[in-house]
Regions:
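N-terminal periplasmic accessory domains that precede
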Residues: 62-65, 83-86, 98, 112-118, ...
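N-terminal periplasmic "start-of-domain" segments of outer-membrane beta-barrel proteins
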Residues: 28-57, 84
């Protein structure tokens, strides 16, 4: 990443005067976030927030965090390799990743690789289940993952340093500093992860060959309040990584893959009584280089640069009613070794409403329409209600129409791209039951999703081409449980999730590949004074790896778990020393056919927090 590459998007944003959205939460101190729609228009759906204590318990990758704490299933081509999710039985391209309110799914592949995001760079990670295309656009069918940075406007100066070392020469470094006053707030974090990743296979000869990787990331946020009504905030995230792709057989040619992602966003927010006006400009760049033989310097590449402008106007006449209009424009410019150089323009308009009628009942509604010359986009809608029948029981209902647009690879691949593709579209409905009694929360949500015009690459005349062919029906149930209790110096918490998922091709009646019928997680933590310990449990059910559901090739169900202990040696400042035992049961398992995961291994770390 050169200095020119870093400065250019900032200049582009300043020149475009399309700045954007923000809001405030008043608590003991003022905390500012960008993705305010997540809070204002998600009351009728399930939103699971994973705070910094949960983030720090897990490995730094987004895959590890979500795999052990949510119902989302992940298929991972070996530790640290390509990782893709299945949320409510949908494909990886039907799960949206939202960075501070901006959809960052790849324009080339249509999905996000969850091993290219370091969770410790963010203050909060939230999981929003169900449709969200009315708010967040393409891919938000199964659900969306939200990565948020926060700004505190209070006099403070803090520093955090974490160093870890583990099996297979796995090393990690994370440093974050934050400074703020009542007018200015800024934070910067730097993360480095690397591993030889040469673990031995369990129960058989051989080891993970050519699996080494490293990645670096920088996350920066800075905000300034010009007055009580106007503020400006800059968000920036840079990621650079290299992974050697693990071999199935030692005789295979060794390959590697380089990722470089740059995301910059400038926001202006004006609070004018009942109106909140927001302008946003963002510049995103994704680029990859694939080396088909690491013995040579030749590579293929792909690159997409995106400019996003958004205007957001929120009208809030009182605490019970909100109406939000959003206008946005996106330009994607792509080029690469195997795609035709193309520029795509997309305009969109959204209308969102949230209304509380009394103390027990509220509803949410939304409409969205996109316009582009590349394909015909459907009118999207969402409608949800929430009613509190009793202090301990709340019922939620939600229905929505969502979609996923074709990617640059789908449309413009030189050897088979199809410019006549239509977006995938889905209709879904869900019912959530939430029970809350003192320190216990338990929720059960049932859902049904119907997807049409699903994209598939199929052989046509000796050439593979994408077409709109499949229809998919998905239904199931999700259960979430949480309990926390503090008695004097003792604190205990228990969290659990369970997902039952049926996702079948309507033509064949077969379950989609890499979608388990069952997944369950649980975590138990206990602390007394300066000592704490935890245990994590993960169960993934059997999955099909062939579209004809031939059970001969199934991946068996597996159970694994992690354990850890930590002690704080500090007083005014925090000096924590911790140890983790990963795959504590030494389970022999894979999540992708023939891509073995490591057995029992360890990690030790030290975390220093000082002011």
């Amino acid at each position: 990443m050169t200095l020119k590459q870093f400065i250019l998007p900032i200049m582009l944003m300043l020149c475009h005067t399309l700045l954007a959205q923000q809001d405030t939460i008043m608590q003991l101190k003022e905390v500012v976030i960008s993705d305010t729609q997540l809070r204002n228009f998600s009351a009728t759906q399930s939103v699971q927030r994973l705070n910094d204590s949960v983030i720090n318990t897990n490995a730094s990758s987004l895959t590890s965090l979500l795999n052990y704490n949510t119902v989302i299933y992940f298929k991972e081509n070996g530790l640290g390799m390509v990782s893709s999710p299945s949320f409510r039985g949908t494909t990886a391209q039907q799960t949206a990743v939202i960075w501070n309110g901006i959809n960052i799914n790849s324009q080339l592949l249509g999905q996000t690789d969850f091993n290219t995001l370091n969770t410790r760079d963010f203050d909060a990670v939230s999981v929003r289940a169900g449709g969200g295309s009315v708010i967040y656009g393409s891919s938000a069918i199964g659900g969306s993952i939200h990565l948020n940075s926060e700004l505190d406007y209070a006099d403070a100066f803090t520093n955090e340093l974490r160093i870890n070392y583990g099996s297979f020469s796995t090393q990690g470094l994370h440093y974050k500093t934050a400074i703020s006053t009542d007018k200015f707030s800024a934070s910067v974090s730097v993360t480095r992860n690397s591993s030889d990743n040469d673990y031995d296979y369990i129960g058989q000869e051989g080891k993970n060959i050519n699996g080494q990787y490293y990645n670096n990331s920088i996350n920066a946020v800075a905000g300034y309040k010009f007055s009580s009504k106007n503020r400006l905030v800059l968000y920036s995230y840079l990621f650079d990584g290299e992974r050697h792709f693990s071999l199935i057989f030692p005789s295979e040619i060794r390959t590697k893959y380089r990722d470089s992602n740059m995301r910059n966003m400038l926001e202006w927010v004006g609070d004018y009584g009942k109106f909140t006006s927001k302008l946003k400009a963002a510049f995103l760049q994704e680029e990859y280089r694939y080396f088909a033989n690491i013995a040579y310097q030749e590579f293929t590449f792909g690159r997409v640069q995106s400019i996003i402008g958004k205007y957001d106007l929120l009208f809030k006449p009182n605490e019970k009613f909100k109406i939000n209009t959003v206008l946005d424009f996106t330009q994607n410019k792509g080029n690469g070794s195997d795609i035709i150089n193309k520029t795509r323009h997309i305009g969109a308009a959204s209308l969102l409403i949230s209304h509380e009628l009394g103390s027990r009942f509220m509803y949410e509604a939304g409409l969205r329409k996109e316009i582009t010359n590349n394909y015909e986009s459907p009118v999207l809608f969402s409608l949800g209600t929430k009613y509190q029948f009793a202090p301990f029981y709340t019922l939620k209902l939600n229905t929505s129409k969502n979609f996923r647009i074709p990617t640059f690879n789908d449309l413009y691949w030189q050897e088979g791209g199809n410019a006549e593709l239509k977006p995938e579209s889905s209709w879904q409905v869900e019912m959530g039951n939430v029970f809350t009694v003192k320190d216990v929360m338990f929720s059960v949500t049932g859902y049904y999703i119907k997807i049409k015009d699903m994209l598939r690459w199929v052989p046509t005349g000796g050439l593979w081409r994408p077409i709109n062919t499949d229809r998919v029906e998905t239904y199931g149930a999700e259960a979430l449980f949480s309990y926390s209790k503090t008695l004097g110096v003792h604190a205990v918490s228990l969290n659990a999730t369970y997902g039952y998922t049926v996702s079948k091709n309507e033509t064949t009646g077969n379950q989609l590949i890499y979608v388990p019928y069952h997944k369950a997680t649980a975590s138990l933590s206990y602390s007394i004074k300066k000592f704490s310990a935890y245990y994590q449990f993960l169960y993934n059910g059997e999955v099909f790896t062939r579209s004809d559901n031939n059970s001969r090739y199934n991946i068996d169900a597996y159970t694994t778990g992690n354990a850890g202990v930590e002690y704080n040696f500090g007083n005014a400042n925090s000096y924590k020393l911790g140890a983790q035992l990963l795959n504590a049961w030494n389970a022999d398992y894979v999540s992708v056919d023939s891509r073995y995961m490591p057995g029992r291994n360890f990690n030790i770390y030290i975390t220093l927090k000082f002011k």
